Amino acid sequence: SYTAKVYVNDIFAGEHSRSGYTPFRLDITSAVNFGAENRIRVEADNTKADTMLPHNGDFDWADDGGITRRVTLEIREPDGIEYMHITEQIDSMQNGLASGTLIIKTNVDKPCKVTVCDYMTGEKVCESSSLTVPFKNLKLWSCCSPNLYLVTLKTDNDILEERIGIRTFETKGERVDLNGEEIYLKGCEWMPGSHPDFGMAEPLDHSIKCL
């Protein structure tokens, strides 16, 4: 829905408005009854307005209302890891392999350990005790070989994992280069939520099957 108001134990916890079908997160610590039962209420409103898409006009996507995705509760440490932003600085590429440095930005300012493993095999390929992680001869991600790695950031009381692919992507006029080689982008239009049995509440496994 276009707008959602969240209440915890009848206490207003926050609002998500004018942002369309995007995920959001709220801190509900002050409204929680620890050690007791809690009640979460989400009021979804799909009323159109001039202040947000589709601006009271025509549109070509499903306009279902309601709660269309999961609502989850996260228990976090006060100084826990909220996010991990990873930038790949590639120094060299040869024969489908790359060497360089992973530069990580996060909200925590405390000692940490970073581990990088092959996503399919679980084999550890590099690690560091800082947010700068040198790597050597990691497999490049490409359309034909979508190699992935799992980056794990760990502190004394929290852990966060992110999947990444090592690649370069740039445009040169009308040309698009992936890993230094020109590619031709092809695709098709698929609108999530268009299935008559599910609408915008289409299950993830069904979406994956369609893809």
Where do the protein language model's features map onto the residues?
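Accessory beta-strand-rich segments of carbohydrate-active enzymes
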Residues: 1-81, 109
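Active-site-adjacent substrate/metal-binding segments within catalytic domains
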Residues: 1-8, 14-17, 74, 78-85, ...
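Outer-membrane beta-barrel proteins
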Residues: 14, 59, 90-92, 139-141
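Well-ordered beta-strand positions enriched in small/hydrophobic/aromatic, beta-favoring residues
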Residues: 26, 40, 71, 149-151, ...
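Non-catalytic surface loops within mature trypsin-like serine protease
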Residues: 30, 46, 75-77, 90-92, ...
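Extended acidic/polar, glycine-enriched regions
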Residues: 33-37, 105-172
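Surface beta-strand/loop "capping" patches
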Residues: 78-108
